[in-house]
């Protein structure tokens, strides 16, 4: 399965975001407003109005954190980060099985991401389920942790049994659309950087970095 989990936000950032969301409780609205015609039938959560100044400010914070993270940049090769929103699921809320729209008003969805803003021991249920051809994978993230996965996968969020789950979600349009090609580039980049850290610069390593850059030019769009 082609996905990445990583700690993205520090405690101070999580606290700042949550305090802002709590202070603007009037901005929460029905999550169905931004779902596609099919997904709206299985979506049951709340979200902050994306046109609000608060949403725009917090979305910019998240976008900057993603673009400043070398691991995420290497994995996702982000061309555009878009559609960032903040959602809340309370008791008996969830999001049924669906696939994300391939094209949104804000861009193409190659990769989807979820960032947890709630400690996982403060709510029951609410696991993110991502389906592949032969497996079903459940994730319950630590506060500040992100998961990035292909938007082509069917996925769902289980009903909340108690407490509430607040997350940030969004999409990435990648310079490389293909899952397989992104994986090859990620492996090559990680291997080259590992060799550089272990052995230092060399003429041979220069050729590997050259090949990576030229492959990205060839495969990217």
Curated annotation (Swiss-Prot):
Key word Iron present: yes
Residues given in the record as 2-oxoglutarate binding sites: 165
Its EC number(s): 1.14.11.-
Cofactor(s) recorded in Swiss-Prot or TrEMBL: Fe(2+); L-ascorbate
Pfam family for this entry, one: 2OG-FeII_Oxy_3
Alphabetical GO biological process terms: DNA damage response; intracellular iron ion homeostasis
Keywords: Dioxygenase, Iron, Metal-binding, Oxidoreductase, Vitamin C
Stored InterPro entries: Oxoglu/Fe-dep_dioxygenase_dom, PKHD_hydroxylase, Pro_4_hyd_alph, Pro_4_hyd_alph_FE2OG_OXY
Domain Fe2OG dioxygenase: 80-174
Disulfide bonds: none
Name this polypeptide is given: PKHD-type hydroxylase A9601_13531
Species for this entry: Prochlorococcus marinus (strain AS9601)
